UniProtKB/Swiss-Prot annotation:
This is D-aminoacyl-tRNA deacylase. The keyword Ubl conjugation does not apply. It comes from Shewanella woodyi (strain ATCC 51908 / MS32). An aminoacyl-tRNA editing enzyme that deacylates mischarged D-aminoacyl-tRNAs. Also deacylates mischarged glycyl-tRNA(Ala), protecting cells against glycine mischarging by AlaRS. Acts via tRNA-based rather than protein-based catalysis; rejects L-amino acids rather than detecting D-amino acids in the active site. By recycling D-aminoacyl-tRNA to D-amino acids and free tRNA molecules, this enzyme counteracts the toxicity associated with the formation of D-aminoacyl-tRNA entities in vivo and helps enforce protein L-homochirality. It catalyses: glycyl-tRNA(Ala) + H2O = tRNA(Ala) + glycine + H(+); a D-aminoacyl-tRNA + H2O = a tRNA + a D-alpha-amino acid + H(+). A Gly-cisPro motif from one monomer fits into the active site of the other monomer to allow specific chiral rejection of L-amino acids. A motif (Gly-cisPro motif, important for rejection of L-amino acids) lies at residues 137-138. Belongs to the DTD family. InterPro entries: Daa-tRNA_deacyls_DTD (IPR003732), DTD-like_sf (IPR023509). GO terms for biological process: D-amino acid catabolic process. The gene is dtd. It comes from the Bacteria.
Length: 145
């Protein structure tokens, strides 16, 4: 399971010209599901995302996690993160989770974060989305479990 996280000062996701999810300070999470992923991996990755210290403390060091910084999550499904780009000029998605598996784990990730008290907005699974963000830093990390 893969989460490309970006520290943002604001982010939003639109579907058909309508904003369906938006946050101010927080993390934009592009979430990719691979074939071997399961609920245990989802919980491990969600915990890591929420606990990862990417926000600056009073000394300017990345020492605060999402909760400590008072941030929110915007979670967007992104199957292309599971692409194999090692050969040729066209990505292969054979390692990506099935649509049913990915939706189940995406929904579980969102609900897990909400259950931990994190304000969580979402995109729309499998929709054609327009994601806008202001990357703060820029700070971007690729987390995998």
């Amino acid at each position: 399971m893969i989460a490309l996280i970006q520290r943002v000062s604001q982010a939003k996701v639109d579907v058909d010209g309508v904003t369906i999810g938006a946050i101010d300070k927080g993390l934009l999470v592009l979430l990719g599901v691979e074939r071997e992923d399961d609920l245990a991996k989802m919980e491990k990755l969600a915990t890591k995302v929420m606990s990862y210290r990417v926000f600056s403390d009073e000394n300017g060091k990345m020492n605060l996690n999402l909760e400590q910084a008072g941030g929110s999550l915007l979670v967007v499904s992104q199957f292309t993160l599971a692409a194999d780009t090692g050969r040729g000029l066209r990505p292969s998605f054979s390692g990506a989770g099935t649509p049913d598996q990915a939706k189940t784990l995406y929904d579980a990730f969102v609900e897990f974060c909400k259950a931990k008290g994190v304000t969580t907005q979402t995109g729309e699974f499998a929709a054609d989305m327009q994601v806008s963000l202001v990357n703060d830093g820029p700070v971007t990390f690729n987390l995998q479990v």
